[in-house]
């Protein structure tokens, strides 16, 4: 087993064990939401790290450095806005993600070109790809 595959498996296991980091007192007031904010209060049990409090995001929860930020498939995620940007992608180590601002017509062109070049498109399902290729 290669080192890369081992690290990808380790990354997946670490992600499964990683707790969901929620903002302090998120359950008291729906207005503040659950998105993570570091606790700064003088008497905050969460900041101190009391065992019966929610987990605080720290360096120890990070994944392996070599595979950090990669797509679960192991490919590097590249944002694409047009067909020209597809040409610069290396299909062996990179995959494309079509930007949200791209319309349907250009999206179809990008999917067709990506299929020709053998590039994986992350945010288009297999059914949509087949539909786009048949047009």
Swiss-Prot record:
Pfam families: Ribosomal_L32e. Keywords: Ribonucleoprotein, Ribosomal protein. It comes from the Archaea. GO terms for molecular function: structural constituent of ribosome. GO terms for cellular component: cytosolic large ribosomal subunit. GO terms for biological process: translation. InterPro entries: Ribosomal_eL32, Ribosomal_eL32_arc, Ribosomal_eL32_CS, Ribosomal_eL32_sf. PROSITE patterns: RIBOSOMAL_L32E (PS00580). Belongs to the eukaryotic ribosomal protein eL32 family. NCBIfam families: PRK08562.1. This is Large ribosomal subunit protein eL32. It comes from Methanococcus maripaludis (strain C7 / ATCC BAA-1331).
